[in-house]
Amino acid sequence: MTIKIGSRESKLAVAQSELIMDAIRRAHPQVELTLVTMKTTGDKILDRTLEQIGGKGLFVRELDQALRDGRADFTVHSLKDLPMETPEDLPLVAFSKREDPRDCLVLPQGAAELDPKKPIGCASKRRQLQLKALYPHMDTAPVRGNVLTRLKKLDSGEFSALVLAAAGLKRLGLEGRITRYFAPTELLPAAGQGIMAVQTRKGMDLSCLAGVGDPDAACCALAERAFVRALGGGCTSPVAAHATVEGETLTLTGLYVSEDETIIRRGSRTGAKQDAESLGEALAQALSQGGEDDAR
């Protein structure tokens, strides 16, 4: 029997799916795999920002349907693009080892510095809000499309720079385009950034995933997503969360942004990694209520 892996059809999505497929083949050489690609709603609508399109699951609806009707047995997602709530019949069953979680700055080819006359292109409110503190004299502007499309827009002169996820550039072999990395203390990543998630339908045989997932990445994912979920946020909201694991201890840093964007607080909590979800919920409550965490 051949196992069908569903993916968005962008070059990055395919590269990510192939990484998961390679991991399955290494752990289970006897398993036969095939890749099934498709366009999602978020891939088709490129003339508006994600916030303007509205709704959840812009990059997953078609993949979810493929799981339900049997066109795919598993789907691979960049975890940061997944809605915080996933359908009960379509559980997340594995999380990859985390690639570089940082955001990075990319200048046009041949440029040595930012052009103050042009905006910095970024795809999320989360990045826009944090960039204001880093580059107070620069404007930001939304940019849509896959990574290669965005880079073409940058190199054609539309933007002074782009802010992108380092993991995506590395997975595409484009690490050389990175001008500088933003430490999480400067620009807190999106929940799940750098982690790939495997989703399936209830009742599927999961034996082919044995040895594929990373337990520490799973704990980080649970904490980060619990934080965002507790604040009522989604994959397009400006809140951010990033967790690290040392031994049995998990440290979570979160960014809270009020609805009118006048209050921005950042704070951290540390606890046992088996309590990842409750840690995320507790930090969300503390920051939303203006607790003693490192609010700013």
Predicted ranges, named:
Residues M1-K39, K44-I45, Q52, Q128, ...:
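Small-molecule-sensing regulatory modules
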Residues D47-F74:
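Short, structured active-site "lid" loops
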Residues R68, D73-S78, S160-A165:
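Paired acidic/hydrophobic, glycine-rich loop segments that form the ligand-binding mouth/hinge
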Residues L79-L82, E88-M138:
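A conserved helix-loop-strand patch within extracytoplasmic ligand-binding domains
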